[in-house]
Amino acid sequence: MADIYPLGKTHTEELNEIIVESAKEIAEPDTTMIQKLIDEHNPEPLLKGVRYYMCENDIEKKRRTYYDAAGQQLVDDTKTNNRTSHAWHKLFVDQKTQYLVGEPVTFTSDNKTLLEYVNELADDDFDDILNETVKNMSNKGIEYWHPFVDEEGEFDYVIFPAEEMIVVYKDNTRRDILFALRYYSYKGIMGEETQKAELYTDTHVYYYEKIDGVYQMDYSYGENNPRPHMTKGGQAIGWGRVPIIPFKNNEEMVSDLKFYKDLIDNYDSITSSTMDSFSDFQQIVYVLKNYDGENPKEFTANLRYHSVIKVSGDGGVDTLRAEIPVDSAAKELERIQDELYKSAQAVDNSPETIGGGATGPALENLYALLDLKANMAERKIRAGLRLFFWFFAEYLRNTGKGDFNPDKELTMTFTRTRIQNDSEIVQSLVQGVTGGIMSKETAVARNPFVQDPEEELARIEEEMNQYAEMQGNLLDDEGGDDDLEEDDPNAGAAESGGAGQVS
């Protein structure tokens, strides 16, 4: 088969090979190559979405200029320079995040032991971290989790910011990670700043500190550098795969901002320029007729400081005031706003848009674009969570708590947070169950009024048992009445009382 990459290895691939070869077993990796990887890494594209989320748009770079007599363009610091950033990107990201994971992800399983472990792990902190992850991956295109076993031997996890990560995959499918490098700045208690780096392989973690411009093994870890993923009975154990979990925003790993940044910039520009015009055109332009008195500078000074002017003979003064194209600007902003919602695949849930048509078909149409975006993101989140629970299951197996297969035994349910007609949803779920096309478990998991499906199912079962018991008592009572008609009334009363006590 012909080589589909005839140009050979890239420089980065060559660096990767050197690092991997030097990191076999517990040999110390080549820190020179690590430094080169860090030098070649550019996190700026990841941070552009973060800037716009924080309303630090490119409009802040706006400058007003003029041309001098020589035709040279210069910055005019005397003119009004409005630089208004609009939080469109934040609106779209927050809407997507709350739509996807505003309601906690619910888990169900026939394996009650596994479900108990999972629900204990998926607490309020889990929900909060997942919300932050969806927000971050929408801003940056990708975000990472790091699962680990803490010093007390407990399973834990933390977000690794994507801008700190250099992740190298085994091949172009980008499924299996070869190794991951994290680098960041650390401030000590005295404010001193230190450069740190961590190299993650499928067996160990190597810790580095930059000293005199060179990354060296971080000796603050003592003999525990490199450190295994976990230990059992004094024996080092590795996960068998690199403990870095990518949460991709999409397959291209790009920010949502990419698809509508130009529209936001245009919106900011028109708004800021219009505000500049309001400030500039408050000044009146004076037309001097037959004016032969003072020079223009003297005229302006007299007018500004003394509110008087001098004219000669038939001279006079007229004024001009420029008209601001407010209507044209407003129409263009309205057009851009409409394009923004389409390009961002977002929902304009203003009263003017929704009106009084909050019924099933109208809401489905309103959320159609957001559903497209959310479906793609949900697939990527599921992939990240499946890998996360694989690590958790490995931890449970290594600690003797059970051998589980979350891929087959665990079901995740995402509840979309939207304006909805709850009565219509519940009615539809009831019809699905009674019609035999939906299980009771699925219906309960999708019920908008249910927070914990397992707890709700337990309550339903308890109520059904109580109802069955009541029905049994009623049947017993009816049987006692029949006996009363045939037997002695006193004996019947005694039997009825006895049955009541037994029940």
From Swiss-Prot:
Quaternary state and interactors: Homododecamer. Has been seen as 13-mer and 14-mer multimer in experiments, but assembles as homododecamer in vivo. Interacts with the gp7 protein. Interacts with the connector proteins gp15; this interaction occurs at the end of the packaging when the terminase complex is replaced by the connector.
Keyword Transport assigned to the entry: answer is: no
Protein name as it appears in the record: Portal protein
What would be one Pfam family of this protein?
SPP1_portal
Q: An example Gene Ontology cellular component term from the record?
A: viral procapsid
Residues that span the membrane, as ranges? none
Q: Which stretches does the entry tag as region Disordered?
A: 463-503
Give the domain of life: Viruses
Impact reported for residue 251 to K: In siz S; 4% reduction in DNA packaging
Stated role:
Forms the portal vertex of the capsid. This portal plays critical roles in head assembly, genome packaging, neck/tail attachment, and genome ejection. The portal protein multimerizes as a single ring-shaped homododecamer arranged around a central channel. Binds to the terminase subunits to form the packaging machine. Necessary to ensure correct procapsid size during capsid assembly. Once the capsid is packaged with the DNA, the terminase complex is substituted by the connector proteins gp15.
GO terms in the biological process aspect are: symbiont genome ejection through host cell envelope, long flexible tail mechanism; viral DNA genome packaging, headful
Gene that this polypeptide is encoded by? 6
Q: Does the keyword Acyltransferase apply?
A: no
